[in-house]
Amino acid sequence: AQNVIAPNTLSNSIRMLGSQSPLIQAYG
């Protein structure tokens, strides 16, 4: 279960940060 939750958390964090940092959107 943790293996599935980890990537989801990263994706969510990257998307939230992407709103403020356009550079991060490239990674998302």
From Swiss-Prot:
Enumerate the GO terms in the molecular function aspect.
Answer: toxin activity
Disulfide bond positions: none
Keywords of the record, alphabetical order, are: Enterotoxin, Toxin, Virulence
Q: Does the keyword Membrane apply?
A: no
User: Extra notes?
Assistant: This strain was isolated from a food poisoning outbreak in Norway in 1995.
Task: Give the protein's biological function.
Answer: One of 3 components required for cytotoxicity (tested in African green monkey Vero cells); the complex is not hemolytic.
Assembly notes: One of 3 components (of 35, 45 and 105 kDa) of the enterotoxin.
Protein name, per record: Enterotoxin
Q: Which organism is it from?
A: Bacillus cereus
